[in-house]
Structures are given as structure tokens and as C-alpha cells.
């Protein structure tokens, strides 16, 4: 009897998930611009600031940066001077999505 109730409950909970979000695992969810902005807040703003001008611990002022997209990607990936590498903590796709966020901080 308990097994029947469990089975019915399991089937009903599976059927109630009709959207793709219920089926698709979170790691397969596309990385969005909003996610990139949040990633900047979490990984970058503590040194660069929300406006790119903080300069904590020698962080460069991103509002005056002239780096190309490739240079920004390389800096995020490998780090530079006191900035650590993020190669092990975020994906290349996420790094590429950070480029427009970083460039949006320019004057």
C-alpha cells in the first residue's frame, strides 16, 4: 500500500512538471546577459567596484580600459599582476559573456 501511494505521488509530481525548466538540468541552462552581470558582481566587483572604478588591491580602473575583447578574455582567463586567474572557476563561455559587461563600464 505504501509503495502504491509513493508510486502515484512520484508519477503525479513528474506530470506536474510540464515546462522545459523542470526537465532540463540547471547546468544545461543557457548563460544569459543577466547571469553575466551577476557573475561580474560576484567575481569582479569586490576589487573593480560596481562601476569599474574601485581599484581595490591594485585592480585596474575598467572605466578607462582600452583592452580589446581578446585581451579582456585573456586577462580574465589567465589573470594579470595581482588579478587572479579565473580559468578554473568559470567557463570560457561565461568569460566571453563578461566581456560586454566589462566594456559597458567604459566612459
Task: Label the predicted regions.
Residues 1-30, 107:
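N-terminal export/targeting leaders of redox proteins
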Residues 27, 31-37, 49-77:
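Gly/Gly-Pro-rich "capping" loops immediately C-terminal to redox-active cysteine motifs
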Residues 36, 40-50, 98, 102:
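The canonical Cys-X-X-Cys-His
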Residues 61-62, 82-85:
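Conserved beta-strand positions that form and line the central face of beta-propeller blades
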Residues 76, 88-107:
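C-terminal capping alpha-helices of c-type cytochrome domains
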Amino acid at each position: 500500500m505504501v509503495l502504491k501511494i509513493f508510486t502515484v505521488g512520484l508519477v503525479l509530481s513528474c506530470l506536474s512538471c510540464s515546462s522545459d525548466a523542470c526537465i532540463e538540468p540547471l547546468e544545461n541552462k543557457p548563460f544569459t546577459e543577466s547571469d553575466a552581470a551577476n557573475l561580474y558582481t560576484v567575481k569582479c566587483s569586490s576589487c573593480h567596484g560596481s562601476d569599474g572604478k574601485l581599484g581595490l588591491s591594485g585592480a585596474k580602473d575598467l572605466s578607462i580600459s582600452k583592452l580589446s575583447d581578446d585581451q579582456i578574455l585573456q586577462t580574465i582567463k589567465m589573470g594579470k599582476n595581482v588579478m587572479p586567474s579565473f580559468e578554473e572557476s568559470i567557463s570560457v563561455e561565461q568569460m566571453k559573456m563578461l566581456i560586454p559587461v566589462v566594456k559597458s563600464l567604459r566612459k
